[in-house]
Design a protein with these regions (language model features):
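Active-site-proximal alpha-helical scaffold in enzymes
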Residues: 60-63, 132-156
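Conserved "HGTGT" condensation-loop signature of ketosynthase/thiolase-family condensing enzymes
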Residues: 1-105, 109-130, 136, 160-238
């Protein structure tokens, strides 16, 4: 399987960062986004949007913008290290108080729920996956996308998203956390677009950003390499 690919469209969201120009400037001097900003997600019908919480809104907003209106069906890989942990944490607190759980809230807390809501809202019937691989979640997502390209898909939508975790879990943090979401439309290597690849290498050490956000910084900055979270790494081809 060829581990080289191009990105022909992208979108990203975080507090204080939404426009492409702002993201490119951020990539030159990155900082950890903080704040309670939430995208409008105006593309989604209000009755559907009301069920989507902050993390889901960020993920669906970048997916909608990246896929576009005229792209048609394509396989999708939704990837999040923690998923909608805030919703899960609230349900665990309800269980601890011996309160009944809402079946709707349980369904919306599953790891593929955000992808499912996107698929339903857009009337999509194609293949989608939901993956999680600790700090190596972006690498796992792109690896899945490369497999789909190898199977003949002309393009794959990759959506990576995470949020700050509830305070009760802070003792388990091994990297900074913040709300962020980004999407790439991945295509086979294209001569008119920069080519990226995954490769073997030394694992990344902790930095000032969540690893998944650092991958976006690498993509936007033009850097030649970025260590991966699992012993692999990212390479930009000249």
């Amino acid at each position: 399987m060829d581990a080289t690919f191009s990105v022909d469209a992208w979108s990203a969201f975080a507090a204080g960062l939404e426009e492409d120009a702002a993201w490119r400037e951020w990539a030159r001097a990155p900082w950890l986004p903080v704040g309670d900003a939430m995208p409008a997600l105006a593309e989604m019908a209000p009755m559907q949007r009301r069920r989507v919480e902050r993390l889901g809104r960020a993920a669906l907003q970048v997916a909608w913008r990246c896929q576009g209106d005229g792209a048609g069906e394509m396989p999708m890989v939704f990837a999040s290290r923690h998923g909608d942990l805030d919703r899960t944490h609230r349900m665990l607190a309800e269980l601890a108080r011996d309160e009944p759980l809402s079946p709707t809230q349980f369904g919306l807390s599953t790891h593929n729920a955000i992808a499912a809501q996107y698929s339903i809202a857009r009337g999509l019937q194609g293949n989608y996956l939901a993956v999680s691989a600790v700090r190596a979640t972006p690498e796992a997502a792109v690896t899945e996308a490369l497999g789909l390209l190898a199977d003949g898909a002309p393009a794959v939508l990759v959506v990576v998203y995470d949020d700050a975790i509830p305070g009760d879990y802070n003792a388990f943090l091994d990297e900074p956390d913040a709300l962020h979401a980004w999407a790439w439309r991945i295509v086979p290597p294209h001569g008119d677009l920069p080519c990226l690849s995954l490769r073997a290498g030394e694992p990344a050490t902790g930095g000032r950003l969540p690893h998944s956000l650092d991958v976006l910084r690498f993509f936007l900055s033009g850097d030649a390499t970025l260590p991966g979270a699992d012993g692999g790494g990212w390479l930009r081809h000249a």
